[in-house]
């Protein structure tokens, strides 16, 4: 009798994806973040579902309903803070996952990579709309500022913004539709994740050396299942430390003030995971230019397969590229810091320099260094 695991139409798919999947024998802990992102997505969908049972998407009651969840619902505070901080963990894992892809040249699987970039956009859109739902000051003004950016689009801008708002300002219609989109997007993300995995399993995983590893594969289970479980335990440990000891560490105190269209907060800023893009947006004095730079700061990831000039796939044996990669990481930290600072000297000029450096490293310096390293191979 053949194993049901290998014959049953549905279980067979799971078997080929998570059990008998041939995986490189040398993939490091940097390859754990895919599974961690899956766990983050599951946590977010489950906690979000339970929050949606008690939340009301109406301007009059939204803020009160969140307070009600935290005070009156059994373990409501836990569900709410797991959802809020789960988003932060999601983005930490996302940034590390993308960084791993850049460092080890995983972007040469360009279908997998491009679906990944679309996923990044989808998660960012979901997180932005989720931030609006508690209807605090920063929710309202964040929504106003970010949606307003679309008015920079020539000809259709103003009409587009009013269409998204469902009126002439961010109001009840906006909140209701943001809740609807925030609910549906994670399921679209789940479908995209399946496509992401489908393309990945067509080629198999990359590995730290960047070399073809077909001659040295091991089964995913038990080797990488146990490794992923360790990663998951560490993720949940960090998340629960954050949730139970300092749940508001990454939030904005302004969001504990109900939304007031007549009172603008002194510093409007998004959640920490958008600050790098926000800094790039603010560093350009022109509105349309800023919006383009904001979109390109993420969209530029799609250019990496084209900009790859090196004869080697991974950066493992390319010290000059490694050095530039870590300068890029430091630059992103700088942009994140600048995004949270007021628009005044010296932060403006630092932000502008960091933004220029960001695009320069990706578009010019890294490809140039790769070509130079190719020359070094001949010496």
Curated annotation (Swiss-Prot):
Positions bound to a ubiquinone: 201
Membrane topology: Multi-pass membrane protein
Source organism, top-level taxon: Eukaryota
SUPFAM superfamilies xref list: a domain/subunit of cytochrome bc1 complex (Ubiquinol-cytochrome c reductase), Transmembrane di-heme cytochromes
Alphabetically ordered keywords of this record: Electron transport, Heme, Iron, Membrane, Metal-binding, Mitochondrion, Mitochondrion inner membrane, Respiratory chain, Transmembrane, Transmembrane helix, Transport, Ubiquinone
Compartments where found: Mitochondrion inner membrane
Residues given in the record as heme b b562 binding sites: 83, 182
Cofactor note: Binds 2 heme b groups non-covalently.
Further comment found in the protein's record: Heme 1 (or BL or b562) is low-potential and absorbs at about 562 nm, and heme 2 (or BH or b566) is high-potential and absorbs at about 566 nm.
Function, in words: Component of the ubiquinol-cytochrome c reductase complex (complex III or cytochrome b-c1 complex) that is part of the mitochondrial respiratory chain. The b-c1 complex mediates electron transfer from ubiquinol to cytochrome c. Contributes to the generation of a proton gradient across the mitochondrial membrane that is then used for ATP synthesis.
Protein name: Cytochrome b
Organism: Tamias amoenus (Yellow-pine chipmunk)
Taxonomic lineage from the root: Eukaryota, Metazoa, Chordata, Craniata, Vertebrata
């Amino acid at each position: 009798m053949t194993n049901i695991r290998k014959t049953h139409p549905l279980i067979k798919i799971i078997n080929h994806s998570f059990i008998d999947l041939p995986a490189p024998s040398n993939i490091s802990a940097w390859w754990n973040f895919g599974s961690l992102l899956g766990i983050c997505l599951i946590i977010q969908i489950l906690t979000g579902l339970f929050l949606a049972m008690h939340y009301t998407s109406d301007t009059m009651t939204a803020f009160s309903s969140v307070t009600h969840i935290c005070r009156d619902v059994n373990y409501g505070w836990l569900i709410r803070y797991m959802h809020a901080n789960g988003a932060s963990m999601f983005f930490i894992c996302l940034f590390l996952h993308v960084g791993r892809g850049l460092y080890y040249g995983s972007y040469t699987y360009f279908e997998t990579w491009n679906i990944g970039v679309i996923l990044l956009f989808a998660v960012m859109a979901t997180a932005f709309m989720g931030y609006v739902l508690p209807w605090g000051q920063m929710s309202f003004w964040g929504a106003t500022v970010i949606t307003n950016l679309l008015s920079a689009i020539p000809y259709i801008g103003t009409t587009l913004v009013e269409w998204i708002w469902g009126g002439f300002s961010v109001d009840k219609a906006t909140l209701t539709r943001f809740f609807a989109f925030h609910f549906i997007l994670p399921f679209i993300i789940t479908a995209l994740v399946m496509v992401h995995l489908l393309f990945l399993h067509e080629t198999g995983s990359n590995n730290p050396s960047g070399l073809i590893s077909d001659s040295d594969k091991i089964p995913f289970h038990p080797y990488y299942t146990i490794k992923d479980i360790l990663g998951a335990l560490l993720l949940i440990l960090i998340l629960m430390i954050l949730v139970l000891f300092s749940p508001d560490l990454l939030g904005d105190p302004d969001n504990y003030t109900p939304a007031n269209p007549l009172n603008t907060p002194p510093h409007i800023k998004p959640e920490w995971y958008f600050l790098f893009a926000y800094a790039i947006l603010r560093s350009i004095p022109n509105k349309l230019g800023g919006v383009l730079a904001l979109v390109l700061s993420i969209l530029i990831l799609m250019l990496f397969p084209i900009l790859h000039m090196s004869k080697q796939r991974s950066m493992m044996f390319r010290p000059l590229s490694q050095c530039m990669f870590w300068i890029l990481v430091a630059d992103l930290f700088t942009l994140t810091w600048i995004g949270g600072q007021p628009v005044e000297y010296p932060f403006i000029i630092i932000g502008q320099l960091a933004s220029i450096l960001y695009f320069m490293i990706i578009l010019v310096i890294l490809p140039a260094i790769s070509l130079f390293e190719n020359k070094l191979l001949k010496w």
